[in-house]
Amino acid sequence: MTSPSARAAQPRPVAAASSDRWWLWMVIAASMLALDQGVKWIVAQNLPLGASIAVTEWFNLVHVLNPGAAFSFLADAGGWQRHALTVLGVAVSVVLAGLLWRGVGSPVERVAYVGLIGGALGNVVDRVRIGAVV
């Protein structure tokens, strides 16, 4: 028979319990990826490249292709950035999926992780498919 103090000292199998929910988080991330690609498809089908729609006085939706990172950082770097940013997007997604597997973070953090995974992989799809992010 094990004493209460010995039972308390034994590590709990966190990964096994987290891996059950991990699939749920990955389904949500895949849904975010599908939503990302769906919205980009709607924009590409209905808004000519370079055109914009005023949503409010201070917010416009503009159809652009960004070969760089955020705010066109590295957009004119000569093409190597496409591959580097693709690898970075996949790497970040793998790290965040690993954190979800381990059960790291609060539920709010996990929702943020799946949003980041969905968006990062959406950008990876764009870079592989058309060489830039819509």
Each predicted region: which residue ranges?
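Alpha-helical transmembrane bundles and membrane-interface segments of multipass inner-membrane proteins
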Residues: 1-134
